[in-house]
Amino acid sequence: MRRFTSALSFALTCGLAVGLPVTSSAQATPAPAPDAATYAGPVAREGDIVILGGRLWDGIGPRSRPNRGILVRDGTILQVGLPPDMDTAPAQVLQLDDHAFIMPGLFDLHAHYAVDLFGDGRVDEYRVNPVLFLANGVTSTFPAGEVDPTEARKGRERIASGEIPGPRVFTSGPYFGTARYGWKPDAMTPDSVKKEVEHWAAQGVRQFKAKGIRPEQLQALITEAHSQDATVTGHLGSGFRGTVNPRDAILMGIDRIEHFLGGDELPDSVSAYASLEYLNLDDPTTRAQVEKEIHLFVEHHTYFDATLTAYGYYGDREPAVFKYWADEMGFLTPYARQVVESHLPRPVNEQFTRIYYVKRRTVKMFYEDGGADLLTLGTDHPSWGEFWSGFGAHRELQAMVLAGIPPVAALRAATINAARALGVDQRLGSVEAGKYADLLIVGGDPLSDITATRHALYVIKAGKVYHPAELFESVKGKMGPTSEAEADWWKGNVRLGGG
């Protein structure tokens, strides 16, 4: 695992995560926690937030505990655990009921802002999607490849300026590989890859995404990214037709792997999906190969983003996971809704259905065989309009639990593990003094019923309190074009010249 080795690199990462310019590192770093030797005790001030009542899960321990009070100042958690006689009068007080549950804000490490409403290519949408992520308690996102880096940059700037509410966006820059519009594999020599990494690192990218990349290109990407104090993740293959098996990428030094584990059980004679859909985990040889690959992840401290529901989304949409608890299609404009409904019902991808249930078993093996602290949450839900990426984290959490992962481990994957995978756990991922005040407060106990994360009472990002119902209401009927005259902007093949 590549750790950020400089304070500047960390500050740039957190700064760019909210759209700040590269020179704004001072704005990105919160005040340190008070020194225990000199701190006289908490005194609430005007502008502070005090959270009282409910139960607290800090993202670290195995259980929740009664919340004895949290003091937030200037976007940072100043203290966890307050004196019962503390004067809170100058502060904004959130007095919670007993059923309220406080936890760190969620991370989505495969958080696509891309939509494809017409079936004519993806575009990145940064006006409604950010609001939907935040309203669902997702306070940090990694897009895992930007279809349109220019539009993504504008979106981050809108969030940073306060024009729209949204999560932290840890920019990935464009895809490195054939997933990028206009990528020319033969022209992208290792030297070309290195120069591109230098360019995007200068723009503040500290995490890169590979998809559809050749071995020599991936090695160049990893080497140069690490020299820039950046990390790399990848959607890889089996080694078939010039792809890279995750096994080999781990040996190259990659930091994270998306989707599937790879290894000897995915031979390079066929595509990864062709092997994965019929993977027989009851066969001792196959099971031993998977276990060997898991041990490689653990040995090299490589993070794994399983994205279970990405395959369920294209597959049979398991009803227990893909049921509605909100009117998601209500966020479409009337015209866009007509377009989306004209394509329904979507065909079921039978291959992805089989892969979904295989992956349920392999992710449980990963957890049980030593990978619990390396498991992260990512959704990979580029949307066709029926389901939105912002809601996906809750579906992914439920799918992980249905796979046999304990709720507390699934929640860690969505909080502290994800923060560590990005190298930002110094300031994010848990409820501790000195960290950014990114919190999700829900009604119910997700440690006993993981679906409780869906019922957000409050979302706090950088110390600002949001009411989810108000956020949802603010973007109803606003996703997509309002008429045929606006349709071309929403067609990636037309506007961006890709597929």
Description of each model-found segment:
Residues 31-47, 56, 60-103:
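Histidine-rich, glycine-flanked metal-binding segment
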Residues 9-21:
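Bacterial N-terminal signal peptides
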Residues 107-114, 235, 259, 307:
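Histidine-centered divalent metal-coordination motifs
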Residues 199-206, 213, 262-398, 402-403, ...:
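Active-site neighborhoods of metal-dependent hydrolases
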Residues 113-124, 178-192, 239-240:
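Active-site mouth loops of central-metabolism enzymes
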Residues 129-150, 166-176, 199-213, 222, ...:
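Divalent metal-dependent hydrolysis catalytic cores, especially in the metallo-beta-lactamase
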Residues 37-41, 56-69, 81-84, 388, ...:
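Acidic, glycine-enriched loop/beta-strand segments at the rims
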